[in-house]
A protein has these predicted regions:
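Positively charged n-region of N-terminal signal peptides that target proteins for export
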Residues: 1-4
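Bacterial N-terminal signal peptides
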Residues: 6-16
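Immediate post-signal-peptide N-terminus of mature secreted/exported proteins
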Residues: 20-57
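Flexible linker/context regions in extracytoplasmic redox proteins
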Residues: 25, 29-32, 36, 122-138
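Amphipathic, charged alpha-helical scaffolds that flank and support histidine-based chemistry
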Residues: 44-55, 91-111
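Short, charged, amphipathic alpha-helical segments
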Residues: 55-60, 81-85, 107-112
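Short, solvent-exposed, charged loop/turn and helix-capping segments
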Residues: 64-83
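The canonical Cys-X-X-Cys-His
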Residues: 113-124
Length: 138
């Protein structure tokens, strides 16, 4: 299982790295908005103990995080890569717990994974006067 997960993450990351060579902030914002909506959906799925939908939500988050990871990698921002990778590993744990029907534990693991997202936001996100956000490269 760990080997399959590792191969899947590497494959997603390699494809995302090729894409991320462009500087498309709008697409990055799209991933962030998608992540927020998908995490909300995942929390609802976990509360409802809906494993199939929860698995789909986790996969979507992992796909987005592969793109986020590639975005930071292409800009040589190692802590951004690390934050995304830690969140991805956390989501893998969530997925395992969902497979075991341990929905409460999965919800707790999701909170831990989200902490990686929050840490990245603290380091790499500035709020503009108009309420929008800008990325800081440090």
């Amino acid at each position: 299982m760990k080997l399959a997960l590792g191969l899947a993450v590497c494959t997603l990351f390699a494809g995302a790295l090729l894409w991320a060579q462009s500087d498309d902030f709008a697409e990055y914002q799209g991933w962030m908005k998608s992540n927020a909506a998908t995490v909300a959906d995942l929390n609802k799925s976990l509360t409802a103990k809906d494993g199939a939908t929860a698995h789909t939500d986790v996969r979507k988050l992992q796909e987005n995080l592969a793109m986020v990871m590639a975005y930071w990698q292409s800009r040589n921002v190692s802590d951004g890569v690390r934050f995304a990778l830690n969140a991805t590993y956390g989501l893998a744990q969530v997925d395992v717990l969902i497979s075991q029907s341990k929905f409460d534990d999965a919800a707790a693991a999701l909170k831990t994974a989200q902490a990686s997202c929050g840490n990245c936001h603290m380091v790499h996100r500035d709020k503009a006067p108009d309420g929008s956000f800008k990325i800081k490269m440090k």
